[in-house]
Amino acid sequence: MRPNLWRTISLLSGRDGARAPLGRRSFLGLGAAFTGSFALGSTPANAEPASPPADAPWSQSIGAGVVDRPYGRPADTEAGVIRRNVPWLTAGTESSVSFSPLQDLHGIITPNGLFFERHHAGRPDIDPDQHRLMIHGLVERPLVLTMKDIVRFPSTSRIHFIECPANGGMEWRAAQINSLQFNHGMVSCAEWTGVRLSTLLEEVGIRNEAKWVMVEGADGAHMNRSLPLDKCLDDCLVVYAQNGEALRPEQGYPLRLVVPGWEGNVNIKWLRRIKLGDKPWFSREETSKYTDLMPDGTSRGFTWLIDAKSVIT
């Protein structure tokens, strides 16, 4: 018997170097040891000896320098991991959506370049030095803030999902596209950095009769929605950074609203105006689009909350 195998038997028996009787469990362990020993020792005589892998071409030359890519990007072999749209879904791309490739993502954070897009009048090109945020209406001290003013306020960072209420809509009537990306790709997650909306509202002073807040974007559609004041004072953020860098233009650069847990369209991008009032505004978007048509012909509005969904990637 091989010395190393006898050593194993000795350890299993609990007595180093002594040939003691084996119990049932030790005997089963001994059988496993024999099996492993014979398996390791049964290499055919004509088998090629194991050898280390050969050096690949990229291991035989000097790689690219540190300034080759001043702004990092994915490897060339990941070129297929991109947002995609469905050409026949809308008449044009300016009022449309692009889908995140959920099947290719890892963890919960969506890279900025893969965060889904939803525009109502295309992506504007905004000069942050010229951008302004006006807060007015039922307030004590109306304000017009520059981006430099906003970043001076105390900041906070939080991780939140944003989901379009139409996510999954490709399958509402019947299965149409055999693709996880197109069926469920209107949801993404990021770390957002900015100022609590409550902080800005405290700065202007809220009048007692104020109950609602209208938020408006600077895009060509002047996308706007009405929100209850209570929600705005709870957890809403006015953000200027996403995943550690300035917002991308398609995500609202230089300023957007994040309304945690509520449907994506209320997370107004390119935020330029906040107005406080005593009732909702019933804007075009929240009456003609973001309402629920009921079986009796009536419409149900202000159904902001996004229900939980699940999908296997």
Where are these regions (language model features)?
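Residues within well-ordered alpha-helical secondary structure of globular protein domains
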Residues: 30-33, 203
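Generic secretory/membrane-interface signal
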Residues: 40-42, 67
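N-terminal secretory signal peptides
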Residues: 1-22, 26, 33-36, 40, ...
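Structured, non-membrane catalytic/scaffold regions adjacent to prosthetic-group chemistry
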Residues: 48-313
